């Protein structure tokens, strides 16, 4: 007989493995009681085998009538509290609390093992679950009779996939359409899986077509899917690993949960705000489960003194991963001794405190486990009160610990760092390490002993483990927390311990691809001279100043604001994006521009009688029309209400200046309008505000007035897959810096030692100033060029030394003394302003003509590869003073206008004809069809040059602009290439 490749056979493989290898019982559909929505016989068997005294005291099974009363109340408890809560906390009936599950035992407790073995894991095929329908669910898993999981299986060989299983859940397993199907109702079953032979998706709450299925795949090659399994189908890990008894118990005890969050929402009828409880049913995704388990295993095996870097994409559920890790780290034991005394979560998100506390309290009745510390006293109190998890803000943490000092050196800590790239600047991490290690040098008499204590304290401490989470690791973060990987050439790369890449998150549909619809606009300006004379200015600085001048002009902002408002209404709101709920963000380069944009957008919204309004967001206050204003003054409501109000009408457009560009989680955000330079981490973090998913969100949109697509592509590529540090930082760069500084003879070796002796012995401040002031006076005698080089090198040393001290064993007492000396000296050195050779420029010019024109509309493609980054750079102090390049204003403006002014409207006909001309070029068509995009682009640009030269007789003006202006040429080439290449790629 040929091999059975049916869906039924896949079902057989799964069920038989659980039965024969994982110790499950195999049940039948008749075991399931449709009236109560559970396996009443197994519930009864479990209780009778473990809690006979409670059964006797309550007479719950004394008669069919009593039994019915018991199961009626039991079923009601499942509906109200949820299956995971009933399993964890038991079920109260009359005078007794019935345990419904016995947790995983420790190795030291044989009695607990006996109880655990009484748990009944059961798998059932073809469960007929409804009183009204004859439908059956392919696979059903229960624990002690309680529903844990359902599965719909599909099979590629019979032409169906996981998508068909999802469709079946959405259309045929709608709980509202069949109220008698209790297993489909909210909270009654922990999770529902759609499974085929390649992929797994999961859903914790069925809502018909609104059901949200998340991936439960391992990932392959940094992307979606599952790797090839040598012994079976790709998804066999589900029944061979995840559904093993110990594994499933672990998930139910430590991960699965129902969380509740109170939120104020506006009543649409009354207009008043009302409190609403948002309920979330959570089951871990595979990467979260795998990450936390690997970290726990490494901690259990390696003890303290380790460091781990977790590179998880934005929007990948880091908050839950951190919560699950923190909760379980405090429970790890070495024999009977806790491996870690306290876990400290360092974050820049205040709301993480509430989230972790709520999540942990959903696991067990532990009201005193978590606390928040915002001062040294609250930290002391938390430690003395036995708090096991303490949350604090990144900037307060080192100073809090510094106050505790040597009291901590005998404690073992787990330090979980949320968004590690932003929390490990040199001085903060150094203070953290010194405090945790207890090496504060307070009781040492000799300077050398003090310095040795401080140097030792700067290193990554041995009485703590570091768990650093970030989506965008910088070189410093990779070296501090990454896993060292020596290479054959002698270099030492550093890699993440665990990763969930941006590529995988996008491919799995968990976050949106924010580069899919990326439109660039170019601003073309013509600036004229308004004075009779022809004054001279620094040519290079003048070009920057003129650009800033025209960008901040009211007419420039007005034209861009008009594009924003028109696009948001016609292309976003009118098209019903996110079910008509779409929001937008406008990213500006300064507070003044943000305020200008806000008022222009508000005026344009009123002009078109739009029902919607804008909000402006910035920190502090700014002078506007002669008075100081804050965001609250302009918006008319407190700053704390901005996030909440952006989720409620009439507010739809958020205008920001260095605010809400990180950490802002609003799934309704659909469009972003960028009028600010973005690069590297800032580009990824800012644009990633759009990537949060929503059941009705199908796409996102970016309109960029400032950045070209190549720059954005490079920024995202760095973090698309694994980010690898190419080599470790070189401590010898510190010697290069000190060599440069000491050329200027602003201090002596004796002065450095004298100051350190006094400083570390805590003398009166007056004894330090005379020493430092000598160096200041010598510095003032240097020429301006030497001052710039010297001060730059001092700052470079101060940036680099704390980092090197933390990650290498090569630090010296001389470096530590110089660090102290420079730290005090740099604050007293005079500011080096330099002469402004553009002073008065703005009074001599005016904006004559302005055009803001769409240049390209494309998807920015990222390459399927890891990215190596170089070690942390350090300034060399070799810059010195730059001599101004003086030029006449007329020449400066001619150069500026050559670069920035093209009369697009005058050559629009020629520009519009280019796509058809390029599509008719056979050399380009062949390259587009038969080679990669990069090769096709090179040929496209070559073909464009030939096409334009042939157009010389048609329009000399267009050809002159194209051939003479490289910026214009590149913009036209990019625009036309993307348009035509996209058509050819799609076979159009």
Go through the PLM ranges and name each one.
Residues 387-419, 423-434, 442-456, 635-643, ...:
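Conserved RecA-like ASCE ATPase "motif II neighborhood" in helicase/translocase motors
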Residues 44-69, 270-274, 306, 332-334, ...:
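Catalytic cores and motor modules of nucleic-acid processing enzymes
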Residues 689-718:
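Conserved segment of the helicase C-terminal RecA-like domain
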Residues 2-342, 351, 355-366, 395, ...:
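ATP-dependent helicase/translocase motor core
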Residues 361-402:
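Inter-Walker segment of RecA-like/P-loop motor cores
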